[in-house]
Design a protein with these regions (language model features):
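N-terminal auxiliary segments of SAM/dcSAM-dependent transferases
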Residues: 1-90
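A general structural signal for well-ordered alpha-helical segments in protein cores
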Residues: 7, 36, 67-68, 139, ...
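Short amphipathic alpha-helical interface segments enriched in basic and hydrophobic/aromatic residues
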Residues: 11, 15, 44, 140-141, ...
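S-adenosylmethionine
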Residues: 111-113, 117, 148-150, 154-294
């Protein structure tokens, strides 16, 4: 059996176990083949982004056993693949992850890399805040994208910040990124030129129906109902009360809301944000100016 054949057989096992995009994927992959390729290539120590060059490589019997063990764990525990491998990739950049953080998949990453945010920046842009940083992936990508800017990365979770520290150090950005323990903006100081935020925003009904893989992630980072609401907008309501005070005249807030556009528009009918185009459509990430938030 070669690598491609092993991946195809593994994908068939995942499908037979009932894993689908709606029930098991969506945390780095969207289908059984890609999920199987991730697990197989990682277990064999092969480059995850170059299947074609190794697809005909024979797989030893011992390697088959190792892959079988990993695949069995994925199916039996319903743990996300990233928690099993302790690694996730975002825009081609590797990040350490474990159960202390959600698995990075923010569409803001696309906007950083493809320069979609750049028209709102200027030579006066100096400071960036990544609010609700989680494992620090957006802060790292922002620091890579804008090498002349200082980046603050804030999160309420000390566990998440510990993982973010691993990733900041992994990419040699300790002198560029400052990690801050903060409940929202409470411990953030001064004004920022660009604020990125991928907050908890999942509504109560969606939280109740999450597949096991998503329930394995920290609920604090997913549920937007921490103050008793049900529409997923609790954190965002609090953010909008205070964020303008830490924005300059030309600062913009780039906010991710996942599949919650309908809830967002009902909660904030007076706002007219700019909606970015992403690989998932134009309902995922929005931009607001300070003028809109005062």
């Amino acid at each position: 059996m070669n690598v491609r054949e092993l991946i195809e057989a593994s994908a068939a096992q995942l499908e037979a176990a009932g894993l689908t995009f709606e029930n098991g994927f969506g945390q780095g992959t969207t289908n059984a083949f890609d999920e199987a390729a991730w697990l197989v290539m990682w277990r064999l120590g092969l480059p995850l982004d170059d299947l074609d060059s190794v697809s005909n490589r024979p797989v030893a019997r011992t390697e088959l056993a190792e892959v079988a063990t990993l695949l069995g764990a994925r199916i039996s525990t319903r743990k996300p693949a990233a928690y099993l491998t302790k690694e996730a990739w975002l825009m081609g950049v590797p990040f350490y992850v474990d159960e202390r953080v959600i698995i990075p998949r923010s569409f803001i990453a696309e906007l950083l890399v493809d320069e979609s945010i750049d028209p709102w920046l200027s030579e006066d842009t100096k400071r960036v805040l990544d609010l609700c940083t989680g494992n620090g992936s957006l802060a790292v990508l922002a620091a890579m994208t804008y090498p002349d800017l200082a980046v603050d990365a804030a999160d309420i979770s000390l566990d998440a910040l510990a993982v973010a520290r691993i990733n900041v150090d992994k990419h040699g950005l300790g002198d560029r990124i400052t990690l801050i323990e903060s409940d929202g903006l409470a411990a953030c100081r001064g004004s920022y030129c660009l604020i990125l935020c991928n907050p908890p925003y999942v509504n109560a009904a969606s939280m109740a129906g999450l597949p096991a893989e998503f329930r394995a992630e920290p609920g604090l980072a997913l549920s937007g109902n921490m103050h008793g609401g049900s529409d997923g907008m609790d954190f965002i309501r609090g953010l909008f009360l205070t964020v303008a005070a830490q924005m300059n005249e030309n600062t913009v807030l780039v906010l991710e809301i996942g599949n919650e556009r309908a809830h967002f528009e009902r909660a904030f009918p007076h706002l007219q944000p700019f909606w970015f185009d992403t690989s998932a459509g134009s309902d995922q990430v929005l931009l607001l100016t300070r003028e809109q938030l005062v």
